[in-house]
């Protein structure tokens, strides 16, 4: 059950791009809006759907490459407003959701008072019944939040809860230029926190790297980030940059993305390149929070 009442309206199929990616808008009871995205993923035997949920209206982290950051933080979402996103996708839009990723608007670890109960509800066999192994929480690197989420991931029923961390740079110098949080939290401190996160046989931890032309996309950067990740032993997810409004950078070329991935793989690092979905609809990674709907 949803723990508190919530009045939301869903504008179904706000955006549907060529791949079937759906970005939808929730209007909250105070008039603010939050966005969520349904991503169709071709599985081994069938198509699955991942729901990218928001945890805040806006975000305070200020990452230069992210559309949501340009809004600033307006407020945290409640647990009910997080669950309402699943309800809207599953019922109003009629899409069976297989996976949940907390990678929408906001920094989830800045709102754990709502996010942790939301995870409990999503994983409840009497509710959505989404296994914890199919739930992933992403962070830019909030150390205290990682510790709290790690405690949850050590408890029965949540031991396969996954953590993704947005590293986005091969070293502190570059990271500080594009992610203000990096001025307070070094990559070494972040790695130490990640190393303490409980792991399981199918992973549990994933590094995310937004590839930005001329910023973090050289061959040397590829080698450097893989060296940094060696002690962690996690996968590296390469995300081609999706330009925000008034972006100072273009999207990377296919050639540059493929080259970076190849160089990284050559070090022995397990690498995946995220397929870009929803860019034209401003529904891709880093593009939520645009002012025109």
Where are these regions (language model features)?
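Radical SAM enzyme core and accessory elements
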Residues: 1, 266, 278-293
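Flexible, acidic/Gly-rich N-terminal and inter-domain linker regions that tether
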Residues: 1-49
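Short, solvent-exposed loop/turn elements at beta->coil junctions and helix N-caps
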Residues: 11-15, 136, 276
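Short, solvent-exposed polar/charged micro-motifs at secondary-structure junctions
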Residues: 17-25, 146-147, 216-217, 248, ...
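Canonical Radical SAM [4Fe-4S] cluster-binding loop centered on the CxxxCxxC motif
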Residues: 42-81
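Conserved alpha-helical substructure of the radical SAM core
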Residues: 70-99
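Conserved AdoMet/S-adenosylmethionine-binding subsite of the radical SAM
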Residues: 90-99, 104-267
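A structural preference for short, hydrophobic beta-strand core positions in alpha/beta folds
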Residues: 238, 273-275
